[in-house]
Amino acid sequence: MDMKMTFSGLVLVVLVTTVVGSSVRRGENSDNLTHCRLFEFRLCLLECMSLTLDHCYARCTTVITQIHGSDTNRFDCTIFKTCYYRCYVLGKTEDHCWKGTATSVTGDVGDLEFC
């Protein structure tokens, strides 16, 4: 089994076993986070990066879109994912990036200047 298939299988298991609509922390922009499936994107990204695979942002965007539908790839969702990913690859802690994205990113294009 190649690494790509293994990753896809692992992500599917993680996403299917995750309680859909998991509670989000108080103060988060929960409607957009739920709609964009940012929680699931986060889990996928962490799994992908732990396996040191390439192109994790693109891989996880594709996986989430396939599982939850094309609405998860709308413009506002792309902004959430981009801000979270930028923070994480800058070496910030995962918890810091999650809290920051969840509490301050609204999905507006202006968010990209500050995330």
Curated annotation (Swiss-Prot):
Domain notes: The cysteine framework is VIII (C-C-C-C-C-C-C-C-C-C).
One Gene Ontology cellular component annotation held by this UniProt entry: extracellular region
Subunit field text: Mostly found as a homodimer in solution; non-covalently bound.
Organism: Conus mucronatus
Domain of life per record: Eukaryota
Tissue and organ distribution: Expressed by the venom duct.
Disulfide bonds: C36-C77, C44-C60, C48-C56, C83-C115, C87-C97
Swiss-Prot/TrEMBL keywords: Calcium channel impairing toxin, Disulfide bond, Ion channel impairing toxin, Metal-binding, Secreted, Signal, Toxin, Voltage-gated calcium channel impairing toxin
Annotated protein name in UniProt: Macroconotoxin Mu8.1
Additional note from the record: Negative results: does not modulate desensitization of the ionotropic glutamate receptor AMPA GRIA2, despite its high degree of structural similarity to Conus striatus con-ikot-ikot (AC P0CB20) which blocks desensitization of these receptor types. Shows no inhibition on Cav1.2/CACNA1A, Nav1.4/SCN4A, Nav1.7/SCN9A, Kv11.1/KCNH2, Kv1.2/KCNA2, Kv1.3/KCNA3, Kv4.3/KCND3 channels. Shows very weak inhibition (IC(50)>30 uM) on Cav2.1/CACNA1A, Cav2.2/CACNA1B, Cav3.1/CACNA1G, Cav3.2/CACNA1H, Cav3.3/CACNA1I, Kv1.1/KCNA1, and Kv1.2/KCNA2. Does not modulate all recombinant GPCRs tested (more than 50).
Any one Gene Ontology molecular-function term assigned to this protein's record: calcium channel regulator activity
